[in-house]
Design a protein with these regions (language model features):
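Structured alpha/beta or helical-core interaction and ligand-binding surfaces enriched in interleaved
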Residues: 1-194
Length: 194
């Protein structure tokens, strides 16, 4: 029996990637960023930096956008002050197309306490009036009917340590393959709990 001294020391942070059961009609994978020892969500600057590396890696160089549908005035003002490109959509939705790494990190750090969306795929290159109207009215529930038109749609809750990806094509193993290179610079253990 190995003693505690014989066990390998795990990195301070873990990214757990696992399939989620959201019903027969919905395929989803959850990503949970936690402190390894406490199992609590990772928050703060380190979390923002890790998520800012994970998001572009998930997209595999496909077009992507962030969708904000609450506290729009604060998001709009932040984007304006930090010269982050954005567009107004459907009244109560603000779309931020592919912010560069430093700006993404700032955005994620500032709005970590918010729930927002992440869309990826060829269709993210152009406005999606139907989805953006749905986001304005129903929030991220609108992704349920739309995610099949995209490589994935993600529900992002950084302060809770969660991103839930709705996708017909991405499995947990593919997500791990995509994010592993991006996480090499961080001390993060990637796990696939069963």
């Amino acid at each position: 029996m190995p003693t505690e001294q014989d066990l390998p020391e795990l990195p301070p942070y873990s990214l757990d990637v696992q399939a989620m059961d959201l019903g027969a009609e919905t395929k989803a994978v959850g990503l949970e960023l936690i402190e390894t020892e406490s199992r609590e969500p990772l928050r703060g600057d380190e979390a923002a930096a890790i998520w800012a590396a994970v998001f572009p890696a998930l997209t595999n160089e496909e077009p992507w956008v962030l969708d904000f549908f609450s506290h729009l005035e604060r998001v709009r003002e932040f984007c304006k002050n930090h010269e982050i490109a954005h567009r107004e959509a459907a009244g109560r939705c603000l779309v931020v197309p592919q912010p560069e790494a430093g700006k993404l990190r700032e955005l994620l750090g500032r709005f970590a306490g918010e729930t927002f969306g992440l869309r990826c795929g060829k269709t993210a290159e152009v406005a999606d009036a139907e989805l953006e109207g749905g986001l304005s009215q129903r929030g991220l529930d609108a992704y349920q009917a739309a995610y099949r038109r995209y490589t994935f749609c993600g529900i992002c809750e950084p302060d809770d340590g969660w991103v839930t990806l709705l996708s017909e094509t991405l499995w947990a193993s593919e997500i791990i393959r995509r994010v592993r290179p991006a996480l090499k610079e961080f001390d993060v253990h990637i796990a696939r709990p069963q």
